[in-house]
Amino acid sequence: MNIRSNPDTTRPAVTTGALPSSRKMFSAPDAAPDLRVPLREILLSEGAGEPNLPVYDTSGPYTDPNVIIDVNAGLPRTRLAWVKERGGVEEYDGREIKPEDNGNVGASHAAAAFKAHHKPLRGIGDAPITQLEFARAGIITKEMIYVAERENLGRKKQLERAEAALADGEAFGASVPAFITPEFVREEIARGRAIIPSNINHAELEPMIIGRNFLVKINANIGNSAVTSSVEEEVDKMVWAIRWGADTVMDLSTGRNIHTTREWILRNSPVPIGTVPIYQALEKCDGDPVKLTWELYRDTLVEQCEQGVDYFTIHAGVRLPYIHLTADRVTGIVSRGGSIMAKWCLAHHKESFLYTHFEEICDLMRKYDVSFSLGDGLRPGSIADANDRAQFAELETLGELTQIAWKKGCQVMIEGPGHVPMHKIKINMDKQLKECGEAPFYTLGPLTTDIAPGYDHITSGIGAAMIGWFGCAMLCYVTPKEHLGLPNRDDVKTGVITYKIAAHAADLAKGHPAAQLRDDALSRARFDFRWQDQFNLGLDPDTAVAFHDETLPKDAHKVAHFCSMCGPKFCSMKITQDVRDYAATLGDNEKAALYPDTAPKANDAAGVPEPSYRDQGMKEMSARFKEMGGNVYLDAEKVKESNRVL
């Protein structure tokens, strides 16, 4: 690209280094041993008596001690060789960056341009370019092999355990396999049930897959506004979000330096990056929706395709005939993109140019393998408006557009609400599957109540867990700042952790083969009072340690058999352990303690039933209780002495 240089220097500071008691590891797929698929291994204590636990890792090179991070140079461009190896692409100069791409920002507010520049690639001819086209042609790409290995969490086949987990879950028609193979990935993509968002110009990408038959994914939104944030803050928020588990990131910048901010993010992002191109297009016409044109919008698409954006939210379902359906709503049109297009349609009294030019948009996006995220511009902004005519009219149109995009060779996912009470959530999922041919569903929450500003990460996390269980493939996080302001670094982490909980809960309910391994490992650590393992197996070790240390800060408390909730005498798990320890000392009477309902059935010579094990055990323990003083809690030395006598 030809980029005008800027004399300023931007040096974003980002968080690096491993999470507590974790190390980066890589798995090599059998089908492509040259690939290095990242995992995070949680290191358990020596006393655990079980192997370390591998978990899915979205953090990229930022947690790899063998990689020197240079944000100014960007991440390694590993995928470039994969794309060129397949052929069917050409390198070209690309469009010149224009002042309006960054909002005509003045020199005093201009951010430094990213220094490393790469000529963009684009597809040529009729040869396969997109992952969908390769899948339909029966070709398994390196991206498909990569995500198959990633979904299996580096494990080889463990079919007995996997099949038991699947049998225990309720997947509502999803077909989660016991083991993910590259061929299964190819079939799901060819069918349109899954996508691998992977622009051929995002060479820094570590591929991931979105689909209802795979792990539920989460997205984190970042981006500046006209009143706050900077390039440095947004790059830092991106790295921070993926550290805690964001599978994709959307840059929703609406202020100055939009192009430059996006370039810095893309060159340093190992996860797919999504955008809403209409936001930047609006900035190019001074924020007036009436001035928008197809030509200006198309130019913005080209700009972002060349940079490497992996998926676009395009509100092509907001049609002129549907706008009046929102007139009686409590909250009208709450989508920014939806309201922009609604105003344009009414001002010109024309059908949306996104709808009328949709096939041209497909042809353009196909050249770069940019995936569609068909936007829900008429989503409900309050539970009073959930599942109304406007929402479902748009959804039906998105189903029609999905078929067009598929015919053009483009990957597609569908965006969903919004604000939906719990009893109406499954209706949304079922209708989306029906109308959109099982294309992956990607929802914002949904929020299940409107009464909790400041806590909408919780109101939406409830709905997110439910719709993820019902079949939603990716959940867009909501932070505590939703409806109140632009999220900061802490809000981003809170939103990501909340949605990791929701996604994992959905995976558990669906019976995903590997989901419960982490739960069980943490439960064993909890019962064994392995505090450090408890902290490290959790989604947020830092917060877990901080909460524990508020009341029990000493190192000795990290090995204590109690916490500050119950104390040493009332810990249920400690009492249970004591019971087990006692049962082990009973010798022949162990069965009486563990299985009190089993008893001899024979009568004695006089016809009187023999005492049951339970009766015998109860009498013995009653006598022993009295002998030892009749106290609920006893001196440990007395108990030991009594056990020796037994």
UniProtKB/Swiss-Prot annotation:
Transmembrane segments: none annotated. It catalyses: 5-amino-1-(5-phospho-beta-D-ribosyl)imidazole + S-adenosyl-L-methionine = 4-amino-2-methyl-5-(phosphooxymethyl)pyrimidine + CO + 5'-deoxyadenosine + formate + L-methionine + 3 H(+). Keywords: 4Fe-4S, Iron, Iron-sulfur, Lyase, Metal-binding, S-adenosyl-L-methionine, Thiamine biosynthesis, Zinc. Substrate binds at N221, M250, Y279, H315, S335, R336, G337, D376, G377, L378, R379, E415, Y442. Its cofactor is [4Fe-4S] cluster. Binds 1 [4Fe-4S] cluster per subunit. The cluster is coordinated with 3 cysteines and an exchangeable S-adenosyl-L-methionine. Pathway: Cofactor biosynthesis; thiamine diphosphate biosynthesis. [4Fe-4S] cluster binds at C563, C566, C571. Its EC number is 4.1.99.17. Residues 1-30 are annotated as: Disordered. It comes from the Bacteria. One of its GO terms (molecular function) is carbon-carbon lyase activity. Residues 1-13 have a biased composition (Polar residues). GO terms for cellular component: cytosol. It is an enzyme of class 4 (lyase). Homodimer. Belongs to the ThiC family. PANTHER family: PHOSPHOMETHYLPYRIMIDINE SYNTHASE, CHLOROPLASTIC (PTHR30557:SF1), THIAMINE BIOSYNTHESIS PROTEIN THIC (PTHR30557). This is Phosphomethylpyrimidine synthase. It comes from Nitrobacter winogradskyi (strain ATCC 25391 / DSM 10237 / CIP 104748 / NCIMB 11846 / Nb-255). The gene is thiC.
